Amino acid sequence: MANQFTDQEEIKCSFCGKTQDQVKKMIAGNGVYICNECVDLSKKIIDDELRADSVKTAIELPKPMEIKKQLDQYVIGQNRAKKVLSVAVYNHYKRISQMDFDSSTELQKSNIAMIGPTGSGKTYLAQTLARILNVPFAIADATTLTEAGYVGEDVENILLKLLQNADYDLERAQRGIIYIDEIDKISKKSENVSITRDVSGEGVQQSLLKILEGTIASVPPQGGRKHPQQEMIKIDTTNILFIVGGAFDGIEQIVKNRLGKKTIGFGAENDVDKIDADDWTRHLTTADLVKFGMIPEFIGRIPIITTLDNLSSEDLVRVLTEPKNALVKQYKKLLSLDGVDLKFTDGALKAIADLAIQRNMGARGLRTIIENSIMDIMYKTPSEKDIEAVEVTKDVIIRHAEPKVIRKKDKKESSKARVGANDN
């Protein structure tokens, strides 16, 4: 114990050489001694090294412009949303890297809400972010969630999905990203107080509050409620980034109604009618989300809100052709593995985009349309080795016509015909 030594020998610190009389405390070990001053110095050295490691981690984290540049390679349009997400995730992981050694200022989590129509890219943006940052990612559907004790899925099961996707690496899971889709579907059924329990609406919002803010959650490793005796896994959600998304059908009118009230009066010009389909998003406030049915406590834990626009026909054509993993590139690659050159005419691409818009599916509907259009070709080509090329036209998409098939023998006969004509 400190300061309890015999007078048989002079006690000195094994590190700095100072005697017991020169320091406040001397701690004895197995044949060695260390003074309080060396303990303080050692702690400072360790803290400095941890700080250096954390700074290095922060430096390796892609900057917002770099994150957006990578998003641009996969996601068409939605520039405003991509900027907001890039800044939010950068600040989130920068906050984590600073927490270990600097607690002078508490930085709050940057949970994000994405509001946009079906097929505008909400889920895909979240997935791409996780891939860029190389962190575990999980998707949950808010419509399957219910308050604890009722039939349905507990909110803790969302964390189990993340843990599973992290291969049960708890540390990695605790720095992952969770995307909760269809969040608008758990809005309150009514603004009025009801005597009946809203277990899939307000009740779920209440259940999500703690994990959104940061808590130690008990997660059943086998999921669900079928194994009540199973030992729980403790997951700290403090550093998990939550992104929620939904279409919020009807919120546009809530915004316009609020703006309209401000212009009512004699001689007042009502500019609400001048707001186009997407411009209303600039006027969206948290109060509008509360009016929609999200409880204030829930919105308070999601400080960053961004909106996504409807994708135009031109945008969807770009989605089909430009990204690294564009659908047209994927199908061309698939058929090329069977020695077939797949081509889409400009008219076909435009027809695919228009059909996705007509069906109100956005980018989400593109794959289904292509798949249905070339299903027979994908069925035949592995067996019919003489197929050299396939051309998909507008009629194939709209009228379900057969794609134009070019066979190797047809090409040879065409070549012979040209040679014969030249001989004559």
Swiss-Prot record:
Chain ranges of the ClpX-type ZB domain: 1-54
Example of a GO MF term: zinc ion binding
Binding site for Zn(2+): C13, C16, C35, C38
One GO-annotated biological process of the protein: cell division
UniProt entry tagged with the keyword rRNA-binding: no
Signal peptide stretch: none
Highest taxon of the lineage: Bacteria
Keywords: ATP-binding, Chaperone, Metal-binding, Nucleotide-binding, Zinc
Positions annotated to bind ATP: P117, T118, G119, S120, G121, K122, T123, Y124
Subunit field text: Component of the ClpX-ClpP complex. Forms a hexameric ring that, in the presence of ATP, binds to fourteen ClpP subunits assembled into a disk-like structure with a central cavity, resembling the structure of eukaryotic proteasomes.
Family to which the UniProt record says this protein belongs: Belongs to the ClpX chaperone family.
Protein name: ATP-dependent Clp protease ATP-binding subunit ClpX
Organism this protein belongs to: Lactobacillus helveticus (strain DPC 4571)
